[in-house]
């Protein structure tokens, strides 16, 4: 039932609203924002809620206690302000991108004299070029790494050319940077590289390959075979990337196709990125829907929130037509892009098929999400947790009789690994006899030092049994920190040990909760073992390279970066060694003779 007293009071207030363009906000009895809307005519639009008997209007008026408004100069400004306020207040009656603040982007700092490609989480009108948003920060970091390898764009934080280092960094010596800090490349040459990076991020791989092929031919003509070989490797990398992408259009159009999957008050949106006629990427986003949400609202809200940051293509295809707001959205998109943007529904069979394929992708993704939800719900029920355990950390120790001891931390968010939050710990404590408990305690102490910036997870999982659990609890008691929840998972019988219980918990082998815990435990073990092997390999390599005249710490780093293991270095031919940037012909011969001299 609607409270007629409050409704009449609100209506009287709205009668005095201006007939201007702007944004209106409904508040509930506690002062919390429940809905944000925009209007060409504020007075007319907000009064319509009182004359409308739709479920949405009834729901808003039932909850509302107060209404406020902001006047804007244009409808496009109202659209932008509405988006800003939805992100700020996250009202229950608006469509929202879940965890919107967390979505990372690629940022090409074109305002700098020597631009860099970096990860950003906030769009700013600073002259940079933004790409995204992406759903995984790992994808962003992989792209940055690939750009370094192919284009040798700088990655340092020096404010060039005002401040710069005295000598080039390791990236120069391993061939991942042209060292503009040392003037080894002109500004004009560097900006040619930047243009190549833009083409790469725009998906113009064939154009880049053609240019690189011409360069390779030129080097070969001039008998500069080492340089030609490096260009050849870059071409192969780009060809491999291009081959993985599916050709979906032969007109080389740049467009995004958007599809939705709605279930209860949740939805998923999928964006297919098509560049130069190839499907180069798909991005899936989770949306929170209000209790009552129309198709128009869903499409409009997602398009606005998604394209208020990151890149905008020439064409955006949505699954169905929507309201008169389409005109304002187009104006907003054109203004943000700085050129014409077409916002439309599918026009041909090719686009219809792609939207059908997108719907299948979303259905599969929804089934996966359901399995994760079952696992998290089961964990919450079994361990009597107050909230769904959306964040889980896993810990393990790896060593060989106490030597090269390391610890690992892996992080799972909503049932999936988030590798940017993985951490490796080189154990500082070196007892006479190996002691896994003391090593584990050191790792946990170091993790808890950063608890303000890095809050505790919902579940902390330890690879081990009752002894490991007790060792970890000792550290929490010592530091007077209250854990959310800790458990230890022993490998042999998959026994789960928890605080305050002497007997282990045994889950059935088909339990979704057990499968998730095993995944976290095994990933922590894998990560620890890989780091342990890396340290052992480095120590072994260093012990050999120390004996070779002319190979110091810097060259050791270069060789480790190039060959990873001692075995790979031993197998390397003299030509392979000569190709490594920073390794002269003379040093390459010394290294080769050290490993191959049979005399």
From Swiss-Prot:
Keywords: Cytoplasm, DNA damage, DNA excision, DNA repair, Excision nuclease, SOS response. It comes from Dictyoglomus thermophilum (strain ATCC 35947 / DSM 3960 / H-6-12). This is UvrABC system protein C. It is found in: Cytoplasm. HAMAP family: UvrC. Interacts with UvrB in an incision complex. The UvrABC repair system catalyzes the recognition and processing of DNA lesions. UvrC both incises the 5' and 3' sides of the lesion. The N-terminal half is responsible for the 3' incision and the C-terminal half is responsible for the 5' incision. GO terms for molecular function: DNA binding; excinuclease ABC activity. InterPro entries: GIY-YIG_endonuc, GIY-YIG_endonuc_sf, GIY-YIG_UvrC_Cho, Hlx-hairpin-Hlx_DNA-bd_motif, RuvA_2-like, UVR_dom, UVR_dom_sf, UvrABC_protein_C. One of its GO terms (biological process) is nucleotide-excision repair. It holds the Pfam family UVR. Residues 19-95 form the GIY-YIG domain. Its main location: cytoplasm. SMART domains: GIYc, HhH1. GO terms for cellular component: cytoplasm; excinuclease repair complex. Residues 206-241 form the UVR domain.
């Amino acid at each position: 039932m609607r409270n007629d007293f409050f409704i009449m009071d609100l209506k009287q207030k709205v009668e005095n609203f201006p007939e201007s363009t702007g944004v209106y906000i409904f508040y509930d009895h506690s002062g919390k924002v429940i809905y944000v809307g925009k209007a060409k005519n504020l007075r007319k639009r907000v009064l319509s809620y009182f004359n409308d008997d739709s479920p949405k209007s009834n729901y808003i008026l039932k909850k509302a206690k107060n209404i406020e408004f902001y006047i804007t100069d244009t409808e496009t400004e109202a659209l932008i302000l509405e988006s800003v306020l939805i992100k700020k207040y996250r009202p229950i009656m608006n469509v929202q991108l879940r965890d919107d603040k967390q979505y990372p982007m690629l940022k090409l700092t074109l305002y700098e004299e020597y631009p860099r490609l970096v990860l950003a989480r906030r769009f700013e009108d600073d002259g940079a070029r933004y790409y995204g948003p992406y759903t995984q920060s790992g994808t962003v970091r992989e792209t940055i790494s690939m750009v370094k390898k192919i284009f040798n764009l700088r990655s340092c934080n020096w404010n060039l050319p005002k401040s710069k280092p005295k000598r080039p960094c390791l990236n120069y010596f391993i061939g991942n940077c042209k060292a503009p800090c040392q003037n080894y490349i002109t500004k004009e040459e560097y900006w040619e590289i930047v243009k190549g990076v833009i083409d790469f991020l725009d998906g113009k791989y064939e154009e880049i390959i053609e240019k690189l092929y011409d360069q390779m031919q030129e080097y070969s003509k001039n008998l500069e075979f080492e340089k030609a070989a490096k260009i050849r490797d870059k071409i192969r990398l780009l060809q491999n990337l291009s081959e993985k992408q599916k050709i979906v259009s032969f007109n080389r159009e740049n467009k995004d196709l958007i599809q939705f999957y709605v279930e209860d008050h949740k939805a998923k949106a999928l964006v297919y990125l098509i560049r130069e006629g190839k499907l180069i990427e798909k991005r899936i986003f989770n949306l929170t829907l209000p209790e009552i949400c129309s198709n128009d609202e869903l499409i409009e809200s997602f398009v606005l929130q998604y394209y208020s940051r990151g890149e905008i293509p020439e064409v955006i295809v949505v699954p169905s037509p929507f309201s008169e707001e389409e005109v304002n959205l187009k104006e907003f998109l054109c203004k943000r892009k700085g050129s014409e943007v077409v916002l439309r529904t599918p026009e041909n069979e090719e686009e219809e098929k792609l939207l059908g394929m997108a719907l299948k992708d979303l259905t599969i993704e929804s089934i996966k999400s359901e399995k994760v939800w079952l696992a998290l719900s089961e964990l919450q029920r079994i361990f009597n947790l107050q909230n769904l355990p959306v964040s889980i950390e896993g810990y393990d120790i790896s060593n060989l009789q106490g030597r090269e001891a390391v610890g690992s931390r892996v992080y799972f968010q909503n049932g999936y690994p988030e590798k940017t939050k993985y951490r490796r710990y080189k154990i500082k404590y070196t007892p006479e006899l190996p002691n896994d408990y003391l090593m584990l305690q050191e790792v946990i102490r170091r993790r808890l030092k950063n608890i303000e910036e890095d809050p505790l997870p919902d579940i902390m999982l330890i690879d081990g049994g009752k002894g490991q659990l007790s060792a970890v609890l000792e550290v929490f008691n010592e530091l007077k920190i209250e854990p959310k929840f800790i458990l230890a998972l022993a490998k042999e019988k998959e026994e789960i040990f928890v605080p305050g219980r002497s007997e282990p918990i045994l889950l059935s082998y088909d339990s979704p909760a057990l499968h998730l815990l095993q995944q976290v435990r095994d990933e922590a073990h894998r990560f620890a073992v890989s780091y342990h092997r890396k340290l052992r390999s480095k120590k072994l390599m260093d012990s050999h390279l120390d004996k070779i005249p002319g190979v110091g710490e810097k060259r050791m780093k270069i060789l480790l970066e190039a060959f990873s293991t001692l075995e790979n270095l031993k197998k390397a031919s003299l030509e392979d060694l000569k190709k490594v940037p920073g390794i002269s012909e003379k040093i390459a011969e010394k290294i080769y003779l050290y490993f191959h001299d049979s005399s």
